[in-house]
Amino acid sequence: MIDTHAHLQGLDGGADAAVERASAAGLERIVCVGADVGAAREAIALAERHAGVFATVGLHPHSAEQWSDEVAAELAELATHPHVVAIGECGLDYFRDHASRAAQARAFVGQVALAERTGKALVVHSREAADDTLAVLREARCRVVLHCFSLPDHLDEAVERGWWCSFAGNVTYPKAPDLQEAARRVPHELLLLETDCPYLTPVPHRGTPNRPERVLDTLAFVAELRGCAAAELATIVERNADRVFGL
């Protein structure tokens, strides 16, 4: 099984220990997210040390004020590393508004362009910004992963456009029936699973820091939603990750 979105850099005990613990629990691969230049460098270094770890490079919307020609060039250089499989996470977050919306838009559009130039997948963060996120993505010419899927009202469009929908631990929460219905309905070829650790810990571990191996809890939950065996769904998710990230 694979965790397609993890922030290993901030986990208690260190990233290397987290990878080893996940491997012991049966998790074979992890996509470690670089949400700014420093985190991207750490993700690449971790991928160099562990055969089952892959990296993304990008600038999170919370940090979008950092976007500049220099940062864009640095991310482009990092994206050439053989262990880098995607650009992001990037996108729009109007819930927190840690950066101005204009800065978020510039950084998002710049990273879409980088994904298009490199041929790598684009990992998208969207929170309380559906309309503006979709307006950008409709013009994008790259593979799109809707990280921590938050657009259940737009599932049909996502499917029509061939965007991958990645569900995190919050799909297991009792007050998430819309996400659960989306996870049940999305075609198997567009389904991914992730932890977004250390955030969004799934039931029954909610209230503690999330870890990569807990994607297995989300896997079991979504498999039950879809009426299939967890092992069958794991194979589907791994195959989809291979396709979208070129693993």
What are these regions (language model features)?
Residues 1-247:
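Mid-domain alpha/beta scaffold segments of enzyme catalytic cores
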